[in-house]
Structure formats: structure tokens, C-alpha cells
Amino acid sequence: METDAPQPGLASPDSPHDPCKMFIGGLSWQTTQEGLREYFGQFGEVKECLVMRDPLTKRSRGFGFVTFMDQAGVDKVLAQSRHELDSKTIDPKVAFPRRAQPKMVTRTKKIFVGGLSVNTTVEDVKHYFEQFGKVDDAMLMFDKTTNRHRGFGFVTFESEDIVEKVCEIHFHEINNKMVECKKAQPKEVMSPTGSARGRSRVMPYGMDAFMLGIGMLGYPGFQATTYASRSYTGLAPGYTYQFPEFRVERTPLPSAPVLPELTAIPLTAYGPMAAAAAAAAVVRGTGSHPWTMAPPPGSTPSRTGGFLGTTSPGPMAELYGAANQDSGVSSYISAASPAPSTGFGHSLGGPLIATAFTNGYH
């Protein structure tokens, strides 16, 4: 007889793996615990049987668990290619306990600093943050190819209280440039499914605040938050073009022909919307397409690898921290920061190196 007692079928995060326990998916809504036990009893002695039900409606959720007295029952079930119960094909599998989901770090000694200007050095960063408390370490992430930093880094303080004080002021001014400071988060928090290991997009903190534009760097176990795309206004807001081999060219389009004047019937005769649409379609005099993204005088030239100008958020979905890097750097990841406003740019092909403040610990 089924009861309304708490259902222990879903293992707690710390539950050890039981090789005799099976997950049974695809159950019919009519399948009962007794029916489930009776069916799997033909494969071995059943120690425990459970059909998972909605706590409010008490309806079956379409799956359950069966635990055998020994592993031989599990082996017999798996040896049979097809199982059918209550006129429905079911899917028995070995059950594994759920892993504990990592929690967001609220107390840490490490912060991520993004948006540093090109002329900012690691000593400048350390000197600035020393006003809040003792700095144990400061680091900027560098490109090996150009030997220039990419506009962001990490600072480690003596205590968590200093970090709280720093992060209360979200934006700080270093070398006449506003930079953003955030608590560094373990990469497991930002990508609990392990997508940070590859090129999958990681969407930390929700889509409303942070979109795409993720540059993955190697820094042991931490990932900082990403920035919304702030590329050229002619592009779709919130998006960047993240193809490393794709070159974004801003080339004027061929001159458009001047359309003849339509005077036979007033455009307003078709309604205001039709008149507005027709007027927008007529290009007069200049001979250029109104959507052409011609570079303004003195602007930064186009870049390869998804870098879209000086207001771009930085590296786009490129994986850094390769195996040939320092082992102390390669196991952490961080996200892109806004490119410095001075207009320098780097290719994204080269690996990164880190420069650290020498403080007797390195």
C-alpha cells in the first residue's frame, strides 16, 4: 500500500552510490508501487520500491526507483533490451546520487578587476587597492604575442572584510579610468555542468545583466562576471560576433541608384505607414546605403577575431589558459573586461601570461 510519507528516492547530495539501486523512467501514470515491485521482482528480490508522486496532487511523476537486495538483479534488468509495464515501454537505468550544486561565493579574499587602461601597471593596481587594506597579491593577464595586458586582472587581499569594503564601491577610478570590481567566483559556480572547459557559452548572473562576449582565461579556479556587449551601435545590441577567423569589415556598399520621384499618386493616399515606408526606401543625392558602417574619422580600424573596436567588451568566447601555461594559472577562468578606451587591440590567437606583484610569495 502506498503512503504519503516523504519519498527518499531522490538521493541527498551526500548520499553514496548504491549499485543495487535503479532509476525507472517512462512509467505510465497508472503504474503503482505494487505493480512496479511485482514487475521487477522477476529479476531478483526487491528491497525497496518507490513511485515518485507530486506532493500536492499525489499524481505519479512518471518515474521511480527500485532497489534490489544484490547487484545480480540489476544485471538481469540491464541484460534485457526492452521492458514494458502497464502497456508502456519503460527505461530502467542504474541510479546515481545527485551532486551537490556549488554555491555562490559570498566571502572571498579575491576580486576581479576589469576595464583597466592600457598604461596601467600591476604596481598601479596594487598601490590603489592598498588604501582599503593589505594586498597579498596583484595580477594582470597578459597576451604573450603582444606582451600587453588585456585590461583586467585579479587582486587578493589579506582578509574577506577588505573585499567587502572594496566591492561596496562597484566602480573605482584607476589612472583616470573607471574600472569594475567584483568578487571572484569559483568556475564551478559559473558553469556547474562543466561547460567552462569547452567553448560553450557560460551565462552567469542572468541574461538581463550579462550577455555573451565571454573570454575564458586561465586563472586557478575562479571566474569573474562578464560584460554586456557595447560594440558599434550599428550592430544588434547585446550581441557580438564571436568567430575567431571571421573578419568584420566596415566597407561602404556600392552606390544605390536614385529612384524616380513618385508624383502620380500622393503617398499619403495609402496611409501614413505606407508613406513613411516608401519615403525611407528612397535614397537621394548621397549615393550611399543608409546602413553602411563607414568608419568615422580618427576611429579605430576594424579588427579580426571578434574584436569590434575600442568599446568592445574584450576577448570573445576564446579559450585561454592552455595546457602549456603555468599550472598555477590554467585551472581558473575569468571573463572579458571592457577594452581600454585608448584604442589598442590585440589578436586573440596568442595564449595569455600573467604578471604578478612580487611580494615574497612567488
UniProtKB/Swiss-Prot annotation:
What is the species of this protein?
Rattus norvegicus
Q: Does the keyword Metal-binding apply?
A: no
Q: What induces it?
A: Up-regulated in the CA1 region of the hippocampus after ischemia.
Domain remarks in the Swiss-Prot or TrEMBL record: The first RNA recognition motif binds more strongly to RNA compared to the second one.
Please list the residue ranges annotated as the RRM domain: 20-110, 109-186
**Which one GO biological process term can you cite for this protein?**
epithelial cell differentiation
By what name is this protein known? RNA-binding protein Musashi homolog 1
Pfam families linked: RRM_1 (PF00076)
Q: Which residues form the signal peptide?
A: none
CDD domains named among the record's database cross-references: RRM1_MSI, RRM2_MSI
Q: Which cysteines are joined by disulfide bonds?
A: none
